[in-house]
């Protein structure tokens, strides 16, 4: 009788133990352990406890002990990989542990957009979205030897960057990032665009320089090919381009208004003083501006000025007298607007 009782007790104990082990296995390996999606950023200096805290705060861990067990089992503390990880609500504890140990990252969107007129702006935009710091990016942008491997210099490196959204891993190194931009540059400059540049008797770099001037003149994309046509007309005629954005560049974009006295600044970038194109882009031109130069409107316009409607558009003219008429109309509108503003104070 006693033997039977002990046997039953042993069976129950084994069954209980098996159930306990199976329960833990199910909890750690099969059962989702997060209540919502979370983006987890793991920095190189982070400890496993900091990662756990970040998980708990962002993904709302349902069973913290399951995380503790699986992290210990997978030796996450010593094997964790920096990265950007997407934690889905359906993720199990063991999956997240493996994700961190094997570095199963989700690519990050890196977006370059808006007006980019300095290397510092490039560095800040990249570092704000990636793990690399702005100092490292800025150093690369000014490193002659580093840029030479991509065919660029610290002076013309603006041309390398084509504003868009690209996917890459958050932990990408400086070289990884520049490799990607060079790859995208080579893809963009396909046979068709190269042929169009050649037809204009311009190199891809010269096209980018011209595009940067267009980019500095207007925010209206429909005007890109029109303004490009104006500057190409001047260029072909051997005229000075007389582009205000190049003067702004000479003063590091610190001028509120470009006055007559600023037009005499002695710089190879000053197109009021020197004929031809500046030696390098004056900003990072977007793809639309580049294509605007490659596909310019065919017209006879030589001049243009801001519209008196103050809507960001321009009025164009073939002759100088027509241009003066447009300029005077704009000046009258500007004076009237300034008076109205002053009266309203």
Roles of regions detected by a PLM:
Residues 1-3, 105-106, 114, 254:
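Generic structural signal for short, solvent-exposed loop/turn connectors between secondary structure elements
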Residues 1-9, 37, 41-44, 53-59, ...:
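Intrinsic structural disorder
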Residues 1-36:
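N-terminal type II signal-anchor transmembrane helix
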Residues 6-9, 37-42, 78-80, 119-121, ...:
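Short low-complexity stretches enriched in small and charged residues
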Residues 23-188:
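Signal peptide-directed extracytoplasmic domains
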Residues 10-15, 58-59, 82-84, 136-141, ...:
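N-terminal start-of-chain detector that recognizes signal peptides
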Residues 47, 128-135, 147-345:
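Bacterial extracytoplasmic/cell-wall-associated proteins, especially those involved in peptidoglycan
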